[in-house]
Amino acid sequence: MPSAPRERFPPSIRFLAWNEAAERFSYYGMTSILTLYLVEHLGQPRNLAISWYSAFAAAVYFMPIVGGIIADRFWGRYHTILWLSFGYVAGHLTIALWESAAGLLVGCTLIAIGSGGIKPNASAFAGDQIPRDRPGLLERLYDLWYWMINVGSLASQFAVPWLYERYGPRVGFGTPAVAMAAALAVFWVGRRRYARPPPTGPSPHGFLRVIGSAVRNVRHAPRGGGWLGGALREHPAWAVEGVRAVFRIS
């Protein structure tokens, strides 16, 4: 007996998946040369360069809280991703064109706001495209999402350091800028195909609520499901998977 045909993703997913790969290329490409740039071109001691990188990474990890609040209460996920992506591109261009400590500070600030603010919304917005009565398709979506993240990040680790060494920081940092501009363009091209849930105010299954639930119920997390599994006692699987995807992106 022939097996049932495999469910297809909605057309919107192809735009979001390639947007994610390009965004991750831009982020990991930029971070792969950040410390080297601080030491070799700005003349910073290595320990100070590492501290700078750590502060930048901390800002990126903090911004998902802000990005989630903005999306839930004000702009919705679509417009949050769209507008923060413009700042993200501007951050890359600032570092590429303004070769100084001040340029790096401004650029890193814009990138932290863009990357961190988009982080909780990109995977959740992709999940918005999948009907809730198709949980198997949602699981496949997050597998695809993780794959696209790996494609973008792995490609950047080879391409960007090589370009930096061969052509200098302007091309090295300019390449992630082009990648992020491409990510924004792909996202915008698919705009008419997206399901766009409006902002609804604080969600009962929001990012912070799921994390808080996971911490409270960590002892009840199913074996092999990671510490976030405890949140399944209070939240649906799609909400927990959305948060899990954020940490995969990090």
Describe each model-derived feature in a short phrase:
Residues L82-V106:
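C-terminal ends and interior cores of transmembrane alpha-helices
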Residues L38-V39, I70-F74, A159-Y167:
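Interfacial helix-cap and linker-helix signal at transmembrane-aqueous boundaries
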Residues M1-Y27:
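Cytosolic juxtamembrane N-terminal segment immediately preceding the first transmembrane helix
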Residues M1-P11, D133, P161-S250:
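Intracellular loop-helix junctions on the cytosolic face of multi-pass helical membrane proteins
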Residues S32-W52:
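Short amphipathic helix-loop junctions that connect adjacent transmembrane helices
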Residues S54-D72, L154-S156:
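Central cavity-lining transmembrane alpha-helices of secondary-active solute carriers
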Residues R73-F86, D133, L137-L138:
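Cytoplasmic membrane-interface "Motif A"-like loop-to-helix N-cap segments
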Residues G117-D133:
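Intracellular juxtamembrane helix-capping segments at the cytosolic ends
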